[in-house]
Amino acid sequence: IPKQGFDKFNIFDEETVNFSERHSQIIKNLSKKEKFFLFLHYTETHRDLVREIIRKEKQESTNDGYYNSLKENSNRYDSYLPACDEYISSIVKTLEECKIKEKTILIFFSDHGTSIGEKEGEKFYGVFTYDYTLNVFCLINIPGITPKNIKKQCRTIDIFPTIMEITGNGEKNSDIQGNSLYELINNKESDERELFVETGGLYGPWPSPSKPNVFCVKINNKKLIYNDTPQTWEFYDLIKDPCEKNNIYKSELMDVINLKKRLRYYLTMNNIEINLI
């Protein structure tokens, strides 16, 4: 996350920090203020995955047992979740102790998912743009608001505009990407929101840590992927093929033609220069 806009920005060693203690103390210090905005980055799950996957597994290997051990890999990931649950409980408890829980808006979200070996070439995340790393959760607790589920596709870039609207700063700056989730929450928006994703892997079949080289556009359960380094296309119907196992790309398909136009739009808008075939 960028430092822009924050009064204070702290970096710490995830190998040694106690997240519950550190973050709870920050909340206690800020609770004396009338208003505050706080972003807490819990990376214990990331740390555990780095220890067990990045440091122990050969990232460039595609013919080892990792890709045949989906159940074991999934169970390993699940074993990290109780610690995450305890962390969240500690944060909520701290808000209660500070007597600010009933006037605090809480937003929990993940920035990405992770691979458990679904696709050869990716053992962690950031290599490809398949849904197992794109789909994430977001929980927003607003005191006094009845719980609702948003089932339509939305994006993490929609979180910031939502915060702006919640806090009464709904007038959107043209430089801000994303849209408030209130239209979806109040059922005033019927269409899914189009998704654009880019990544550049640290490892995998075509690593590109200095610039993105894999891109995708996704809308209405149709998904187009462009892999720039090998210059290959993929297209998936996610209703019929939710695990993205059957690439049905054909350049003459109308869905493909339309999604290519949208991909070009996003590349231009974000000043990304690639040799799009």
Features from the language model and the residues they span:
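Catalytic domains that recognize anionic headgroups
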Residues: 1-277
